[in-house]
Each structure stands twice: as structure tokens, then as C-alpha cells.
């Protein structure tokens, strides 16, 4: 199979270029820091709607919110979320 050139730079040329490492030495750490801030500030809980670790169990509801019967799951979920 003799394939032609796609006109793209070889990967080895890209990762050995100085420009690649200048760009990525800034972007990779900044992505890490922004992800850490997203989680550590609690914004991830607000964006995705998940409860914070201290909100899983309230004073009124100390049992595990578990659905037991798949055919009456809607009613069980309504009962579990009634006090929220």
C-alpha cells in the first residue's frame, strides 16, 4: 500500500520543536491549576448538581437513598426526595 503524503508535519517534528514546548509548558500547568481550583472551590458541585460530602445525609434522612423496586422507581424517588 503506497500512500501519499497528507501534507501534515510528522509527530516527531512537532514534539521536538521549541515552539511546541513553549506553548505546552504554559497550557498544561494552567489546565491543571484551573481544574484544581474548579474542584477545590466547590464550583464542580454547583455546576454538576452533585451534593457536597456533608450533604449526603440530613438530620431527617439518615438511611441510604436506595431504590429497591425498578417498577416503582418513580414513586420511590419521589418519596426519597420529598424533604429536599
UniProtKB/Swiss-Prot annotation:
Cofactor(s) the record lists: heme b
Residues annotated to bind heme: 24
Localisation: Plastid, Chloroplast thylakoid membrane
Transmembrane residue ranges: 22-36
GO biological process terms on file: photosynthetic electron transport chain
Any one annotated GO CC term: chloroplast thylakoid membrane
Annotated membrane topology: Single-pass membrane protein
Assembly mode: Heterodimer of an alpha subunit and a beta subunit. PSII is composed of 1 copy each of membrane proteins PsbA, PsbB, PsbC, PsbD, PsbE, PsbF, PsbH, PsbI, PsbJ, PsbK, PsbL, PsbM, PsbT, PsbX, PsbY, PsbZ, Psb30/Ycf12, at least 3 peripheral proteins of the oxygen-evolving complex and a large number of cofactors. It forms dimeric complexes.
Entry protein name: Cytochrome b559 subunit alpha
